[in-house]
A protein has these predicted regions:
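Short hydrophobic core segments
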Residues: 37-48, 71, 114, 223-225
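An anion/pyrophosphate-binding glycine-rich loop and adjacent beta-alpha core
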Residues: 70, 76-192, 258-264
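Glycine-rich loop(s) and the adjacent beta-strand/alpha-helix scaffold that form part
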Residues: 42-96, 149, 241-258
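Glycine- and aromatic-enriched mobile tails/lids
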Residues: 14-15, 110-119, 123-128, 138, ...
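Alpha-helix capping and helix-loop boundary segments enriched in small/acidic/polar residues
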Residues: 31, 35, 51-62, 93-104, ...
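Feature captures the FAD/FMN-dependent oxidoreductase FAD-binding
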Residues: 1-39, 167
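FAD/FMN-dependent oxidoreductases across multiple families
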Residues: 177-221
Length: 286
């Protein structure tokens, strides 16, 4: 059974035998405001990243890092939280992503003077440089006063030298987004862009079986994490494009299998006397 519109606010850990063990979660029912306690032999966190802590992000409004925060409040560690990736070509001020395919098709980044500035930062690969290099270069242009717009806080993506048919056929999303959100036609106009917060490499530390680690070697029995909220350290400090899809497929599957296998043999841990007490206080103080 699926419980839609339930928002998990706390993790229940059993510490009756000393070391923590997953025992369930406490959730807030959005439709009624009721607090519910769910017992569980195994728990998987797949709560996504925390892009909404930044002013401009490609992330959904719900991605505020709550899963990571819940784990941290239970005294468990987080890992590599400083490793956050910015996608270079987000629509300025909005964060809506414009695919890197635009530069792959021949799109050029220009500053307010019309200069193809990536020639200075990456003379060989220019606009096809990795995300971190391009993002830093764009920020540097703005910091040094070569940004465009009323506040000089973005640069331009130039596709106007490409055939209109190529843009419409190969980059339909870009044309739609730019026209819809900015009223700009990429076929004939420069598109305002600036780096947008995109992906967290850090998060809840796990091993390759997605078991959550409470230190470098010991796991929390029954607790698993996968996806962007987890840090299994496969991306290092700078994820390569599309590797997040590979990550969630591989480790999402592993988490499901591992959690099911654990639950099939484990006993249900006892719940603390007032399992929902902290959450009730938290909600009442909002």
């Amino acid at each position: 059974e699926f419980y839609n519109e339930f928002y998990v606010l706390d993790l229940i850990l059993d510490r009756s035998e000393g070391e923590p063990k997953a025992a369930g979660v406490v959730a807030y029912e959005l439709a009624t405001g009721e607090i519910h306690v769910f017992t569980a032999k195994s728990v998987i966190f797949a709560s996504g990243g925390f892009g909404k802590v930044f002013k401009t992000t490609s992330n959904a409004h719900t991605l505020t890092g709550d899963g990571m925060a819940i784990v941290y409040r239970k005294g468990l560690p987080l890992e590599d939280m400083e490793f956050y990736q910015f996608h270079p070509t987000g629509l300025a001020g909005l964060g809506v992503l414009l695919t890197e395919g635009a530069r792959g098709e021949g799109g050029i980044l220009r500053n307010v003077d019309g200069e193809r500035f990536m020639e200075r930062y990456a003379p060989t690969i220019k606009d096809l440089a990795p995300r971190d290099m391009v993002s830093r270069a764009m920020l540097q242009e703005v910091r040094e006063g070569r940004g465009a717009g009323p506040h000089k806080d973005y640069v331009y993506l130039d596709l106007t030298h490409l055939p209109a048919a190529q843009i419409e056929e190969k980059l339909p999303d870009i044309t739609e987004f730019a026209r819809t959100y900015l009223g700009v036609d990429p076929v004939s106009e420069l598109v305002p862009v600036f780096p947008t917060a995109h992906y967290a490499m850090g998060g809840i530390p796990t091993n390759i079986e997605t078991e959550v680690l409470r230190n470098n070697t010991d796991v929390v029995p029954g607790l698993y994490a996968a996806g962007e909220c987890a840090c299994v350290s496969v991306h290092g400090s700078n994820r390569l494009g599309t590797n997040s899809l590979l990550d969630i497929n591989v480790f999402g599957r592993r988490a499901g299998i591992a959690a099911a296998e654990y639950a099939s043999t484990a006993e249900q841990p006892p719940l603390p006397e007032d399992a929902a007490g902290h959450v009730v206080s938290l909600v009442e103080n909002l």
